[in-house]
Amino acid sequence: AKGRKGSIVAVVKGTRSEDVVAHFRKIPQKLRKQVKEITLDMSGSMKLIARTCFYNAAQTVDRFHVQKLALEALQEIRIKHRWKAIDKENEIIAEAKKKGEKPEFEVFENGDSLKQLLARGRYLLYKSRENWTQSQKERAKILFGKYPDLQKAYQLTDELRKIYNQKIIKSVALLKLAHWFK
């Protein structure tokens, strides 16, 4: 883009703020003051670099990192429930062993045990519901019926994904994000 609007100024290897700042300081301050916006990840070093070198520029967090953070939070909820299910299953096994019986686990209509449901549910949580297979739809119905907090977290993550996937002007996007945040 030869320095025009929307062009990439530099791609710098590494995230050590001292190295990156030294690299950007090679660009004259007059030119760095003209930069209006910087896209960066959520790391503290990137924010420091942006503040130090491009103090007039607005900082925009890369959508990939925002969505990644939301998905990680969603998976954390699933994993928390999975550990509880594993503990419960281990208790059932220990109790059955004491009694000399075969352990009996709850099996859902799709054939999954609770532990399997939470393990296999991992992949559907990464996808938009429009892209689920029939078995993923069935699994989601059971999973969300059993864990309403997981359903709420999935809905929030999916709504965020949809906002980012729309081709809309900035003011509309900000409004949608504000509604999503409530």
Predicted regions: what they are:
Residues K2-K5, V21-K26, K30-N56, F64, ...:
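Acidic/histidine-rich catalytic cores and adjacent linkers
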Residues A10, D62-F64:
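Flexible, active-site-adjacent loop/turn segments at secondary-structure boundaries
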Residues G3-E18:
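Glycine-rich phosphate-binding "P-loop"
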Residues L71-W83:
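Short, surface-exposed amphipathic charged segments that create phosphate/polyanion-binding patches used
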